[in-house]
Amino acid sequence: MEPIPLPSYIHYELLLQLLERKTMFAVSPQSSQHQQVHQLIITLRKALAIQKQLEQSCERSNLAVEHRWSLNETNHREIKN
């Protein structure tokens, strides 16, 4: 069975760093946009936590997981096969 493709953690980290270091400071602290950015950060952190839970579940079920950097990796493999 092929490994289950999942996003590399760096994708989450890059988005979180951008939102926390740049976007939060670009919007007014008392604005609705500030609250939306805050909620987006929370959602990304939850998504990363859920992905880690999925990986643990796969490990317990002896299913391989492969962290992907891009969709191009998939296309490259499909071309090879």
Functional labels for PLM-detected ranges:
Residues 33-81:
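Low-complexity intrinsically disordered segments
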Residues 1-30:
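N-terminal acidic leader/helix
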